[in-house]
């Protein structure tokens, strides 16, 4: 029973990490988004078609927290895109492996995008494949691989998924 309790506690901690992650994105706290990752993290967004074919090419590929911060600065000051908000829905969070202090998880996501005209659409759906580690500051993403099912990205992918 002790292992079950420990497994449930770990799952809940990861669930809360994911909720903080999407909370930062959905509530325009983008400057806090990189804090969810380790310094040596990997963050990538890849179409399912490429992932299924073993092709590593994605539409976003960041290899450390500095690149994530640069992405936010670019969004705030350099990129031009239509104002929008995201609302993430996640489900099916599962711990699939634990080894050497790393926890691998999978979950499903759907992002609804609302544009400045008030129109809302399903923007993207897919899966998160995450590697989570414990740090002195709590759980952090060491790797987040976003595999989107949607056949094409309808507008500029400005805000992280």
UniProtKB/Swiss-Prot annotation:
Induction: By anthranilate but not by benzoate or salicylate. Expression is positively regulated by the transcriptional regulator AndR. InterPro entries: Anthranilate_1-2-diOase_ssu, NTF2-like_dom_sf, Rng_hydr_dOase-bsu, SnoaL-like. Pathway: Aromatic compound metabolism; anthranilate degradation via hydroxylation; catechol from anthranilate: step 1/1. One of its GO terms (molecular function) is anthranilate 1,2-dioxygenase (deaminating, decarboxylating) activity. Keywords: Aromatic hydrocarbons catabolism, Dioxygenase, NAD, Oxidoreductase. GO terms for biological process: catabolic process. The keyword NAD applies. It comes from the Bacteria. Pfam families: SnoaL_4 (PF13577). Its EC number is 1.14.12.1. The keyword ATP-binding does not apply. It catalyses: anthranilate + NADH + O2 + 3 H(+) = catechol + NH4(+) + CO2 + NAD(+); anthranilate + NADPH + O2 + 3 H(+) = catechol + NH4(+) + CO2 + NADP(+). It is an enzyme of class 1 (oxidoreductase). Part of a multicomponent enzyme system composed of a reductase (AndAa), a ferredoxin (AndAb) and a two-subunit oxygenase component (AndAc and AndAd). Belongs to the bacterial ring-hydroxylating dioxygenase beta subunit family. Oxygenase component of anthranilate dioxygenase multicomponent enzyme system which catalyzes the incorporation of both atoms of molecular oxygen into anthranilate to form catechol. Can also act on benzoate and salicylate but not on 2-chlorobenzoate or o-toluate. This is Anthranilate 1,2-dioxygenase small subunit. The lineage of its organism: Bacteria, Pseudomonadati, Pseudomonadota, Betaproteobacteria, Burkholderiales.
């Amino acid at each position: 029973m002790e292992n079950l309790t420990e497994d449930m506690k770990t799952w809940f901690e990861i669930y809360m990490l994911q909720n903080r992650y999407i909370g930062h994105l959905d509530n325009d706290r983008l400057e806090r988004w990189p804090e969810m990752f380790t310094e040596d993290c990997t963050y990538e967004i890849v179409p399912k078609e490429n992932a299924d074919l073993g092709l590593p090419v994605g539409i976003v590929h960041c290899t450390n927290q500095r690149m994530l911060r640069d992405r936010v600065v670019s969004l705030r000051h350099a990129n031009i895109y239509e104002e929008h908000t995201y609302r993430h829905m996640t489900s099916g969070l599962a711990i699939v492996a634990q080894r050497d202090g790393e926890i691998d998880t999978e979950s499903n996501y759907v992002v609804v995008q609302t544009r400045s005209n008030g129109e809302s659409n399903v923007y993207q759906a897919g899966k998160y494949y995450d590697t989570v580690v414990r740090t002195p500051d709590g759980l952090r993403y060491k790797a987040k691989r976003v595999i989107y099912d949607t056949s094409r990205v309808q507008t500029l992918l400005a805000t992280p998924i």
